[in-house]
Amino acid sequence: MCIRDSGSTGQIGSELTMKLRSIYNGNIVAGYIPGAEPKGELKESGPSAIVDITNEQQIAETVSKYNIDTIYNLAALLSAVAEAKPQLAWKIGMGGLFNVLEVAREMGCAVFTPSSIGVFGNNTPKDKTPQDTIRNPRTMYGVTKVSGELLSDYYHIRFGVDTRSVRFPGLISYVTPPGGGTTDYAVDIYYSAVKGEKFECPIAADTFMDMMYMPDGLRAAIEIMEANPDKLIHRNSFNIASMSFDPEIICNNIKKYMPDFHMEYKVDPLRQAIAESWPNSLDDTCAREEWGWKPEYDLDSMTQDMLAKLKVRFNK
């Protein structure tokens, strides 16, 4: 097996590439764009290639050169960034996905393209949002994710391409710094706590969103591609869930271990509006039943691990 991970130096890709290499003996090609070259262990642990997701020929040449049979297509702009640059978000998110699916159709590759809680909108059921429900987002990020789900399903039904996906909640990581996503406050807050800084929260109290610790997210992305296809009723895309909280809950959980931590609110209207359009929590029954999904971390175990890892990182 040889896997190409596009967006390999991004928020998810940098960690997913290393996880895949640990499982598949380094036989993973890290795709990147000029100016975002892999560094350190990511560079040294396996092959890498410049791949412009908007260039179908370049994708095809890379797939052919490395005999790739599975593509993890992670190239995308984050939610708040996509709102600032909607044209670029569509070009990368949908133009890039179309190119990947065309190459997969022609060359027999399986494709994983992550979706998101961003596919849902204001009139979606907010609590325990069902697997199959209304998807009408009001952000370009969400529009590209819904369109990506539909296009991926089309390529599976029409051309037999093995497309699979999960709807990621907000992903929380101690490895990759936050990069402008709506849920990134839940990463920033740990950084501030460990550095001994006051945290200014851009999301209002009582705003609940689904979140997940990155190790669970990486495992979900791998397990869905390893799942028995005969048992998959859904493909693009599965709800997956781990925990749901608002800023007060995560703040109080951090205070269990760092009592002097202090948080104030400085709400960002753009990110707040996006957050309010997303579900409070997801129903992931289908993922559990069809391919055995089960998270390993809850809020408290994540907090303990995040604080421990960041203290080592910042010598605290």
Could you say what each language-model-derived stretch is?
Residues 1-3, 247:
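Short, small-residue-biased leader/transition segments that mark boundaries at the very start
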Residues 4-23:
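N-terminal Rossmann NAD(P)H-binding glycine-rich loop of SDR-like oxidoreductase domains
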Residues 53-92:
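NAD(P)H-binding glycine-rich loop region in Rossmannoid oxidoreductase-like domains
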Residues 116, 150-175:
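Conserved beta-loop-beta element that borders a ligand/cofactor-binding pocket
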Residues 134, 165-178, 188-212, 216:
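A conserved pocket-lining segment of Rossmann-fold NAD(P)-dependent short-chain dehydrogenase/reductase
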Residues 146, 159, 172-187, 214-215, ...:
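Glycine/proline-rich active-site loop of Rossmann-fold NAD(P)-dependent oxidoreductases
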Residues 202-204, 209-316:
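C-terminal substrate-binding subdomain of Rossmann-fold SDR/epimerase-dehydratase oxidoreductases
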